[in-house]
């Protein structure tokens, strides 16, 4: 007499199934350790012998450039999350003050409406964004970038020498900038309430001695 296999309610054969043995499908620890050592050794050799061209006139290899962009964008987004944004960024006085600061400090790299590329802007890598074309950053992210700068981009940390209030003035202007014609830009720059040095002296939370110590509007920073 031949025993028939047990059949479940669904009509399929009920076969004992063993749990998946992950150890059979994953590399062993010695293999992982050896592979890590080899990759680290190759990276060390590449760095030591200077294969990678660090010159500003030699663009990054595409995978490296892609990774750096992701690192930059995520780093800025995470750190800007705690920034408290003022409610008066559309205030005309803020915008005018920011225009004066922008004209003094930023046009050499970021240009302005109707302005030709400068020698500095042409020599930068990565190239500085032309801010009159707009940016995809939030006000909080723009403030963080202006205050802390960005490594290896020639973007300085203006927070070492400028107050939070002045940097928010710059944010207010930068957000207005893409909508300005060259003539409107010149007009608004001329309307700046004071020159750069006077604006800095008048700020109550001006960093002392360039130390960057100020009443920070960033929570937890």
Locations of the language-model features?
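N-terminal amphipathic/basic-hydrophobic helices that include classical n-h-c signal peptides
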Residues: 1-14
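Periplasmic c-type cytochrome electron-transfer domains
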Residues: 15-96, 100, 120, 137, ...
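Short hydrophobic/aromatic-rich motifs at helix boundaries and adjacent loops
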Residues: 78, 113-116, 143
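Sequence context surrounding c-type heme c attachment/ligation sites in exported
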Residues: 96-107, 136-144, 187
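Periplasmic/extracellular electron-transfer cofactor-ligation site
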Residues: 99-126, 151-157, 178-183
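Extracytoplasmic electron-transfer domains, predominantly the class I c-type cytochrome c fold
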Residues: 123-179, 221
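Short, flexible loop/turn segments with low-complexity composition
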Residues: 183-193
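Short terminal (N- or C-terminal) low-complexity/amphipathic segments
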Residues: 185, 217-221
């Amino acid at each position: 007499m031949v025993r028939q296999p047990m059949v479940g309610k669904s009509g399929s054969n009920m076969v004992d199934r063993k749990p998946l043995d992950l150890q059979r499908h994953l590399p062993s620890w010695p293999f992982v350790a050896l592979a890590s050592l080899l990759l680290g050794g190759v990276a060390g050799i590449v760095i030591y012998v200077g294969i990678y061209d660090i010159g500003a006139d030699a663009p990054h290899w595409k995978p490296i450039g892609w990774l750096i962009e992701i690192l930059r964008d995520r780093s800025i987004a995470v750190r800007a999350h705690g920034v408290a944004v003022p409610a008066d960024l559309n205030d005309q006085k803020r915008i005018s003050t920011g225009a004066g600061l922008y004209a003094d400090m930023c046009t050499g790299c970021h240009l302005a409406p109707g302005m030709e590329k400068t020698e500095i802007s042409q020599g930068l890598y990565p190239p500085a964004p032309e801010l009159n074309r707009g940016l995809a950053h939030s006000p909080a992210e723009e403030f963080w970038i202006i205050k802390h700068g960005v490594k290896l981009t020639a973007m300085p940390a203006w927070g070492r020498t400028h107050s939070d209030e002045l940097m928010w003035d710059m944010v207010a202007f930068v957000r207005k900038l893409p909508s300005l014609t060259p003539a409107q830009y010149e007009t608004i720059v001329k309307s700046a309430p004071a020159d750069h040095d006077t604006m800095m002296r008048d700020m109550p939370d001006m960093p002392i001695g360039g130390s960057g110590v100020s009443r920070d509007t960033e929570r937890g920073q």
